[in-house]
Amino acid sequence: MERNFETVMIEQCAPVLASLKPAGLFRYETSDCADLARRVRSWNEQLGEKGLCVRVLKGCVRTHRYLVYVYRESKLRTVLAQPQVRDFLCREGYTLPEQSDDYAPLLRQLSRRLCCEADFPHEIGVFLGYPLYDVVGFIENAGRNFTCCGCWKAYGDPSAAQRHFAQLNKCTTVYLRLFRSGTPIQRLAVAA
């Protein structure tokens, strides 16, 4: 069953629109690839001035399922330029661009891994703004032994993680309420 693109974007990416997270990801199902391409183009035009980008990271025309990535360019650039994140991605097999703030080649590599590898690339967590220690903890523990589970599995201070998850969940609740009452996404998206 196809769901409304905009509603799914709010449900999964409200904290990105509110500038609380650098990026979010959602699965969107549609049999109309051309319509999806138009929507992505349109949202890039409408949200670009707020520092937001929308792109399809993975798509399957057979199943009509797509992974749509919504991100704040400046925040993503900052996250992926951190030396410890670059070292982690290098250890995970990514070829690092010469310029530490050039994130585009890293997104292309992530997209390739999503499309072509049998194993899910759990390093995607850093591309979504999860703390590096949570991403590493998830990989090293195969998703077990976490201290707290909310928007993702946390491996650090459970109280801090719960507070952060509560903030993200509250944002999503408020944004959904505003969106359903008629506030357009363009007004919900804050400038970076």
Describe each PLM feature range:
Residues 1-32:
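Short, extreme N-terminal leader segments that mark the start of a protein/domain
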Residues 39-101:
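A glycine-rich, hydrophobic loop/mini-helix early in the fold
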Residues 120-147:
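Hydrophobic/aromatic-rich, well-ordered segments within soluble, folded domains that form packed cores
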Residues 93-122:
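Internal catalytic-core helix/loop-beta-alpha segment
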Residues 93, 115, 136, 148-163:
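Non-catalytic, substrate/partner-engaging modules appended to enzymatic cores
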Residues 12-19, 55-60, 112-116:
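Short, flexible, solvent-exposed loop/turn segments with mixed acidic/basic and small polar residues
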Residues 151-192:
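Long, compositionally biased
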Residues 31-34, 47-48:
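Conserved catalytic core of nucleotide polymerization and phosphodiester-bond processing enzymes
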